[in-house]
Amino acid sequence: MHDIEFIKNNPELFDKAMLSRGLESQAAKIIELDLQKRKLLTELYALREQRNAITKEVTVLKQSGADCSSHVETSKKLAHEISELEERIKRDTGLSYLLCSLPNIPDDAVPFGKSADDNVEVRSYGQKRSFSFEIKPHYVLGEMLNLMDFRRAAFLSGSRFSILSGQLAALERGLASFMLEMHTKEFGYTEVFHPSLVNDLAMFNVGQLPKFTHDSFQTTDAMRLVPTSEVVLTNLVANTNLHRNSLPLRFTAYSQCFRSEAGSAGQDTRGMIRQHQFSKVELVSITDASQSNVELERMLSVAEEVLKRLELPYRVVLLCTGDMGFSASISYDIEVWMPAQNKYREISSCSNCKDFQARRMGAKCFYLEKQNKRSSFVHTLNGSALALGRTIAAIMENYQNSDGTITIPDALRKFMSADYIRPGTALP
């Protein structure tokens, strides 16, 4: 959600920001709609004053026994006009919808660009392994090991689903435990277990609605399956006014995520890279405005630490204006090396949304200044640490052996009680 006063005071700056996001100039239209709304509000206040004055006159006339029928009729007429005007204002002349449909303003540090091709590499980590045998993609390895079944998943649920069994199922569980233990015990995040169904308001608050209505799965009673734990963890502070000294707040959750993947037909149709259902460990931070840039770098380092301990090569890229998410003001992607594809693939995205989400959900913080309470919107940040399906795929491809087994990274062995992933028994 955008600050209308900022737009009115900085129309050229706002238009430049929207143009960098690939949109047309919007400031003039927003200012005109705001002016229309203010005119309607002025009319409404005037009608209410008239009605209040007549109501007082009616009271006096009744007390004196005088005829007040004409005043009563006028009052009824005004009440009807007020009701109609309130309804017009509620419809808002399209102002609120427009403000809610426009993406966040990019931070000054964000490079201009139209697509992922314009993202800027910040750093890379780790040595890419050299293989003395033909590299197999993770989905081939999984089926060879009898531990990954796409055929049965398709029979049950359709395309873009998978079934893991045996040691791969244990790897999923072990990865979640490894990540959560690290985030909570070493980096101070509070673990949260939450519902997988949320209402439209929760989705709106984080910017998933109204723009991305078709990207989520909706139930028959108008609930939605969570596309990411960000929805729930960020909404934990909706409609609050927190003391600034209580910040930052840091939450983490392991959950199933559900996405329709609208617009991705033909992309990554095999394997675990792009699925309708996947699991993820999410990080969310709530800060004040002065802390959010530092918190973003901290969050990014936490996500990187997962990959460092798994000894997976990766790189960090700063997203350009044309590739950032709707609610983000600045985003870093972490891309893990996938040997079978011979390229890096996104495994995490860490974003600072600044006050964009907080304005939508009414999340503020306050401090006392000479006994006066000063409030401002909080800043919200979110990041994946990490997407488990892609982490499993990366481990399988980077740690594969010539005999088809997978070496388990040292950091995971205490969670797996094994050194290798070996062939299992096929499902019936």
UniProtKB/Swiss-Prot annotation:
Q: Which CDD domains match?
A: SerRS_core
Binding site residues for ATP = 259-261, 346-349
| Top-level division of the source organism's lineage | Bacteria
| Any GO molecular function | ATP binding
Annotated catalysed reactions:
tRNA(Ser) + L-serine + ATP = L-seryl-tRNA(Ser) + AMP + diphosphate + H(+); tRNA(Sec) + L-serine + ATP = L-seryl-tRNA(Sec) + AMP + diphosphate + H(+)
Q: Which family does it belong to?
A: Belongs to the class-II aminoacyl-tRNA synthetase family. Type-1 seryl-tRNA synthetase subfamily.
Q: What is this protein called?
A: Serine--tRNA ligase
